[in-house]
C-alpha cells in the first residue's frame, strides 16, 4: 500500500502540471504528509494541517518508513515546498502570513482547492477540477502575491529609491538602520551599498535587495557572499568611512572573532571602516553586551538619538587597534 500511495501522489502532482523534478518520490512523500494520508487511508480523508518541515519529515518517517536525515530539511524546503508554493498547491503560514521568513514557526498547508481535488481522486471528477485549477492559477497567484505584499516592509533609500523587504523583525531593523541611524550618524553624503533580505539567505524568493558591487570594488572591497557581508553596508562619501552594520535580532553582534573575520576579508579596503552593531531594544543589547568587540559602536533602534561606544580614544570613526580576544 505504501508504494501504491506514493504512485498515486506522483500521478496527482504530474496532473497538476509540475515538472518531473517536482513529481519525484520526495515530492510524492511530501504531498502525502501535507494531506495527512497514511498508507491505508482513502484520499477522501485528506486534510490540511499546518506543518513545519520537520513535521513533514517525521510523518514520512513514521508512516512510510522513508527516513530523511536532518540535513535533508533544506532540500525538502527549497526543492519541493518552495515549488509547491509557487504552483499554488500550498500556502505558507496560513495562520499568520506576516510571519518572518526565517521564523522557526514557518509552516506549510494544502489550500482548499487542492483538498477538493484530492477528495475526488481517483474515481471522482478530479481531472476536471485540476483543469479548472490550472485555468485559474495565474489569478490565484496574483491574489496570493498581493496578500504577501501587504506585509512587506517598505524602505526609502538615501537616494530616494523605494524597495521593500520580506516581513520579520530582522528586516524591520534593517529599515530602522536606513531610516533612523543613517540620517543621524552617517549624514546626507551616505550611500547604501548593500542591504540583504532574510528571504534571500533562505533561498525563498528574496534577493540581495541592494548590492552595488562596482562601488564596493572601487573601495577595495572584494566580492563577498551575503553570509559574509554584514547586514547593511553604508559609505559616507564626505568622511570616506565605510559603515559595516550588523543587525542583531537572533544571531550575534560584532564580536572580537567576527571583527577579525571582517578585517581579514576587508584587508584590501582603502577607506576607514566603522563597525556598528544595531539592536532593536535595550533588552536585546543587554543579552549580547558581553560579546561585543572593543573599538566598535552600538546603536539601539528604540533610542535612536544615542550610541554606545565600545572604545576609549574617540567618539565615532575607524580604528587601527585590534580588539582584545577574550
Curated annotation (Swiss-Prot):
Cofactor(s), names only, from the UniProt record: Mg(2+)
EC number: 3.1.21.4
InterPro entries: BsuBI/PstI_C_sf, BsuBI/PstI_N, BsuBI/PstI_N_sf, Restrct_endonuc_II_BsuBI_C
GO molecular function, one term: magnesium ion binding
GO biological process: DNA restriction-modification system
Catalytically driven reaction(s): Endonucleolytic cleavage of DNA to give specific double-stranded fragments with terminal 5'-phosphates
Pfam families: BsuBI_PstI_RE, BsuBI_PstI_RE_N
Keywords (A to Z) from UniProt: Endonuclease, Hydrolase, Magnesium, Nuclease, Restriction system
Record flagged with keyword Magnesium: yes
EC top class, as a word: hydrolase
Family statement drawn from the similarity comment of this UniProt entry: Belongs to the BsuBI/PstI type II restriction endonuclease family.
Complex formation: Homodimer.
This protein's name: Type II restriction enzyme PstI
Amino acid at each position: 500500500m505504501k508504494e501504491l500511495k506514493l504512485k498515486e501522489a506522483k500521478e496527482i502532482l504530474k496532473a497538476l502540471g509540475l515538472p518531473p523534478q517536482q513529481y519525484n518520490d520526495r515530492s510524492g512523500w511530501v504531498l502525502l504528509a501535507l494531506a495527512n494520508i497514511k498508507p491505508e487511508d482513502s484520499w477522501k480523508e485528506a486534510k490540511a494541517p499546518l506543518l513545519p518541515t520537520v513535521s513533514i519529515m517525521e510523518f514520512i518517517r513514521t508512516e512510510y518508513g522513508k527516513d530523511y536525515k536532518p540535513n535533508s530539511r533544506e532540500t525538502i524546503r527549497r526543492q519541493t515546498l518552495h515549488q509547491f508554493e509557487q504552483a499554488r498547491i500550498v500556502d505558507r503560514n496560513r495562520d499568520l502570513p506576516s510571519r518572518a521568513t526565517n521564523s522557526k514557526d514557518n509552516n506549510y498547508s494544502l489550500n482548499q482547492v487542492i483538498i477538493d481535488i484530492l477528495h475526488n481522486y481517483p474515481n471522482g471528477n478530479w481531472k476536471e477540477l485540476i483543469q479548472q485549477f490550472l485555468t485559474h492559477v495565474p489569478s490565484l497567484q496574483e491574489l496570493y502575491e498581493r496578500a504577501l505584499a501587504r506585509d512587506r516592509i517598505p524602505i526609502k533609500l538615501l537616494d530616494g529609491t523605494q524597495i521593500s523587504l520580506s516581513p520579520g523583525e530582522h528586516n524591520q531593523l534593517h529599515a530602522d538602520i536606513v531610516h533612523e541611524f543613517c540620517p543621524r550618524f552617517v549624514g546626507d553624503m551616505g550611500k547604501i551599498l548593500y542591504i540583504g533580505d532574510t528571504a534571500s539567505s533562505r533561498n525563498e524568493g528574496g534577493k540581495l535587495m541592494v548590492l552595488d558591487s562596482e562601488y564596493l570594488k572601487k573601495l577595495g572591497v572584494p566580492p563577498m557572499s551575503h553570509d559574509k557581508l554584514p547586514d547593511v553596508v553604508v559609505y559616507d562619501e564626505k568622511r570616506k568611512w565605510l559603515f559595516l552594520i550588523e543587525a542583531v535580532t537572533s544571531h550575534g553582534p560584532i564580536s572580537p572573532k567576527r571583527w577579525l573575520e571582517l578585517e581579514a576579508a576587508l584587508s584590501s579596503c582603502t577607506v576607514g571602516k566603522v563597525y556598528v552593531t544595531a539592536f532593536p531594544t535595550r533588552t536585546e543589547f543587554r543579552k549580547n553586551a558581553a560579546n561585543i568587540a572593543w573599538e566598535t559602536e552600538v546603536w539601539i533602534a528604540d533610542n535612536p538619538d544615542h550610541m554606545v561606544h565600545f572604545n576609549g580614544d574617540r567618539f565615532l570613526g575607524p580604528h587601527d587597534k585590534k580588539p582584545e580576544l577574550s
